[in-house]
Amino acid sequence: MDKNKVKLAIAPIGWTNDDMPELGKENSFQQIVSEMALAGFTGSEVGSKYPRDPAVLKPMLDIRGLEIVNAWFSTFFANGDREKTLDEFINHRDFLHAMGAKVIGCSEQSLSIQGTAKAVLEEKPHFSDEQWRLTVEGYNQLAKLAAEKGMTVGLHHHMGTAIQTCAEVDRFMAQTHDDVYLLFDTGHAYYSEGSQQAMLAMLEKHLARINHVHLKDVRDEVVAEVKAQRLSFLEGVKRGTFTVPGDGVIDFDPVFKILDDSGYRGWMVVEAEQDPARANPFEYALKARRYIRQHAGL
């Protein structure tokens, strides 16, 4: 892959988990960003321990050669919370714009079970036609608001949400305008569909509208536990559903080739949440960086 087109970032979720603050509570912001830089990454997404004042955050990243590339934003259009979502989005957009980011990754969290004790596979939510309409209209509006600052919006398909499966992603992309993009996540695509083939099919089908990429690997044996024991999304994470590229079942070589052949420009982000007490974040960041260097040439 071309280093002039594609840059590498890593998310702080491997150090400390915003959905389960007890995981990695001992890891400070300063430690997190220092270890990211030491591991050889040049970008970061935003976690709960990050200062939200750009005047404070930016110098701390600048001295480490890091920049902010995205920050999770939860939308609630299907619930009918349009105005509240739009107001909060504008504040979020302005923060990311001040930090120099070009992408805003959003997840539609109406009916989401990702933070609950419900079985992530058996009890996933589904939208009615009206909820789909509200979501599509909302994301079309987000794209306009993002464009005011020269930014783009990407939908983060996610386990435990109503936009998770290939079919649901297809419907979302077909119904939204072309200026609404997809934040493609290898781990969530594989986890949802259960195969490398289906994950690659999602990537190839929506290649022209992918504006951000999350790289995470999957441990099949843990997914089997999640299915057999009807576990929640977060319980699966604690047991090790996800890991860094090269440490699980996914073959990333075709992912890198497809993106490279398409002329993809932007960030690839190692975003692999697991229990830092079981998987040392710095060691796993180094492992991911080594694998990507060997397999993507970055």
From Swiss-Prot:
Its EC number is 4.2.1.44. Keywords: Cobalt, Lyase, Manganese. InterPro entries: IolE, IolE/MocC, IolE/XylAMocC-like, Xyl_isomerase-like_sf, Xyl_isomerase-like_TIM-brl. It is an enzyme of class 4 (lyase). GO terms for molecular function: manganese ion binding; myo-inosose-2 dehydratase activity. Belongs to the IolE/MocC family. This is Inosose dehydratase. It comes from Erwinia tasmaniensis (strain DSM 17950 / CFBP 7177 / CIP 109463 / NCPPB 4357 / Et1/99).
